[in-house]
């Protein structure tokens, strides 16, 4: 009975006590640091979107120079590479046209992308490939930043604005001297039309990216990729026979360019669509300016077209701006829980 008295309920000092762990020192073995979503999106846009798309413009110009391949016919060949995605959607049991509640927006996204690509392919046939890509990417970056501010109230940091300003300045340095040809009669008129088409292509691209960010349903990416091919064929096939003359490529070089354009454009489409869901659309478009640098290199080494010193200086400014944007967004997310 005496042992049950509270004064006798003392700890047994004869037994060793368990080792104590400081409560203030968390364990370092239960969390990892991985790249953030914005970092992943920007790297995908840089490596998969910008670099692959940089080959599309010069290859399109090569196909036009060797076989006089019309822009709408090139768009048809590109859309054909998107149609096999229907097999993936059927295999997964998803509707080909997307859920009924978002079907209109998905079709609008496809129409804007087809318009953007059609304008881009038409522009590279009348102006140098590097300049056409420059104007298109510059307008898409500026329009994406303005649309994000107006529609989403999504601001940017000071470093991001610095990178956007630098990349746009680099594009102006590249394309500015070429605007002097606008005063050379009929040639200048076609040149002006090419720059206008490139600008409209960038505007349509920025609108399409904003619409894609509002689509949230399973298999969104393969659905919009398939719709791009479907809508592109519906628009370009009648337009080819009404506005242009169909040409069947006869040489191996033309067919190689057509296949390369289709595959590289599909890779770029998928990567850009993924990246814009992870990072700010204006930053994604700014990183895609790497396409301009690749196009200028191919313009000089493959197409043997003149690259002015202003092109080289502008390309350097663009690369520096991309480095600023990428470095500012290099952050990591901690994975896992920290134990106390």
UniProtKB/Swiss-Prot annotation:
The subcellular location is: Membrane
User: What GO CC annotations are associated with the protein?
Assistant: membrane
Q: What is its main location?
A: membrane
Membrane topology per record: Multi-pass membrane protein
Give the residue spans that cross the bilayer.
39-59, 69-89, 107-127, 160-180, 189-209, 223-243, 257-277, 283-303, 307-327
Q: Which UniProt keywords apply?
A: Membrane, Repeat, Transmembrane, Transmembrane helix
Entries under InterPro entries matching the protein: EamA_dom (IPR000620)
The segments labelled Disordered in the record are 11-33
EamA domain sequence ranges: 51-176, 274-327
Q: Which family does it belong to?
A: Belongs to the SLC35G solute transporter family.
Protein name (Swiss-Prot/TrEMBL):
Solute carrier family 35 member G3
Specify the species. Answer: Mus musculus
């Amino acid at each position: 009975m005496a042992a049950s008295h509270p004064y006798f309920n003392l700890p047994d000092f004869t037994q060793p006590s368990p080792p104590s762990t400081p409560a203030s020192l968390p364990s370092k073995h239960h969390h990892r640091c991985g790249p953030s979503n914005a970092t992943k999106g920007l790297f995908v846009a840089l490596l998969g979107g910008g670099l692959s798309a940089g080959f599309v413009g010069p290859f399109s110009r090569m196909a036009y120079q060797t076989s006089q391949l019309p822009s709408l016919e090139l768009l048809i060949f590109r859309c054909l590479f998107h149609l096999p995605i229907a097999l993936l959607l059927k295999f997964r049991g998803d509707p080909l046209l997307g859920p009924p509640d978002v079907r209109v927006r998905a079709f609008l996204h496809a129409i804007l992308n087809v318009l953007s690509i059609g304008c881009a392919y038409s522009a590279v046939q009348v102006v140098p490939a590097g300049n056409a890509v420059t104007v298109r990417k510059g307008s898409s970056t500026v329009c994406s930043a303005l649309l994000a501010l107006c529609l989403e109230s999504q601001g940017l940091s000071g470093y991001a604005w610095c990178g956007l300003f630098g990349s746009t300045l680099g594009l102006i340095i590249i394309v500015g001297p070429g605007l002097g040809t606008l005063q050379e009669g009929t040639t200048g008129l076609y040149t002006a039309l090419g720059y206008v088409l490139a600008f409209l292509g960038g505007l349509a691209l920025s609108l399409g990216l904003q619409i894609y960010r509002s689509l949230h349903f399973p298999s969104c990416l393969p659905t919009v990729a398939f719709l791009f091919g479907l809508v592109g064929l519906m628009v370009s096939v009648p337009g080819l026979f009404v506005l242009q003359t169909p040409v069947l490529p006869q040489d191996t070089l033309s067919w190689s360019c057509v296949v390369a354009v289709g595959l590289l454009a599909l890779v770029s489409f998928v990567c850009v669509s993924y990246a814009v869901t992870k990072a700010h659309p204006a930053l994604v478009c700014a990183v895609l300016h790497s396409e301009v640098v690749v196009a200028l290199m191919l313009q000089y080494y493959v197409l043997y077209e003149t690259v002015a010193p202003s092109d080289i200086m502008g390309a350097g400014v663009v690369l520096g701006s991309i480095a600023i944007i990428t470095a500012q967004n290099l952050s990591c997310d901690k994975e896992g829980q920290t134990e106390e």
